[in-house]
């Protein structure tokens, strides 16, 4: 467990405060988990973003009438902190009985508080239900590897030695799997996700990728660190010209988390999958 997470509200009984309470936000420094992967804030081998989507966003108009919407938050992957998910939920719940004179006032408040917690500017979009409904759900790009016939026996810890590639062949391809699962390091609750690997480099053995991804099944870590570990293990093996790894997780507590990591600048969309 991350030492800072022990002091977070995650896994504890909490009072749900219904009026504006930014002190609910609990930042967790990324540095400890980066150190486990052998990287520092100065040597990050990726660019990217963590998209958070909130489906329980509500506040009051000056008339007292409530409004509901969907929040989209973009936290830079190089921000000093992640925001612990239950604290994020408690903070958003604190807006439920809070009056905002305009949508702009609400958005400015969210940007200020979330940026302060993350330690870097956080992008905020407040979207109408009609807008999100019209967008619908999308399928992941590339080839799904979940139908491959593989024998699997390890579920406890990620095992990069399972990965194999053809060093004599360079390919450019996109692969995806819906079989990513890990566990919350604090509560032990399951985190279900779908993962995409886009790369140009040594030809990755698809079956080995599937067995590797399933090896996360009982692993305890936060969403962001799981994606960073996958990214680094593939980068070390494939020596790619470019590599992008991203995962879209099933929501819990009204929030879903979607980390993106890439060798270069990316402009990811934030479109929902069928399980989101």
From Swiss-Prot:
SUPFAM superfamilies: Tetrahydrobiopterin biosynthesis enzymes-like. It comes from the Bacteria. Its EC number is 1.7.1.13. InterPro entries: GTP-CH-I_C/QueF (IPR043133), NADPH_dep_7-cyano-7-deazaG_red (IPR050084), QueF (IPR029500), QueF_N (IPR029139), QueF_type2 (IPR016428). Keywords: Cytoplasm, NADP, Oxidoreductase, Queuosine biosynthesis. NADPH binds at residues 85-86, 252-253. Homodimer. NCBIfam families: QueF. This is NADPH-dependent 7-cyano-7-deazaguanine reductase.
């Amino acid at each position: 467990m991350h030492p800072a997470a022990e002091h977070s509200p995650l896994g504890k009984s909490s009072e749900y405060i219904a009026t504006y309470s930014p002190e609910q936000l609990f930042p967790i420094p990324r540095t400890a988990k980066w150190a486990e992967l052998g990287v520092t804030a100065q040597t990050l081998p990726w660019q990217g973003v963590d998209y958070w989507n909130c489906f329980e966003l509500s506040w009051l108009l000056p008339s007292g009438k409530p409004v509901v919407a969907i929040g989209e938050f973009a936290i830079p992957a190089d921000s000093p902190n992640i925001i612990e998910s239950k604290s994020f939920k408690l903070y958003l719940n604190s807006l439920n009985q809070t009056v905002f004179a305009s949508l702009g006032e609400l958005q400015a408040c969210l940007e200020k508080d979330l940026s302060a917690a993350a330690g870097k500017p956080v992008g905020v979009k407040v979207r109408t239900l009609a807008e999100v409904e019209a967008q619908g759900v999308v399928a992941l790009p590339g080839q799904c590897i979940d139908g491959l016939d593989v024998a699997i026996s390890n579920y406890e810890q990620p095992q990069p030695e399972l990965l194999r590639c053809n060093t004599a062949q360079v390919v450019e391809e996109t692969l995806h799997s819906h079989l990513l699962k890990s566990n919350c390091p604090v509560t032990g609750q399951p985190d279900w996700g779908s993962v995409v690997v886009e790369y140009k480099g040594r030809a990755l053995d698809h079956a080995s990728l599937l067995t590797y991804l399933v090896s996360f099944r009982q692993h305890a870590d936060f969403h962001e660190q799981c994606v960073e570990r996958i990214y680094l293990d593939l980068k070390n093996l494939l020596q790619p010209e470019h590599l992008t790894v991203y995962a879209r997780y099933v929501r819990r507590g009204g929030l879903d988390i979607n980390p993106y990591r890439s060798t270069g600048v990316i402009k990811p969309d934030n479109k929902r999958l069928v399980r989101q």
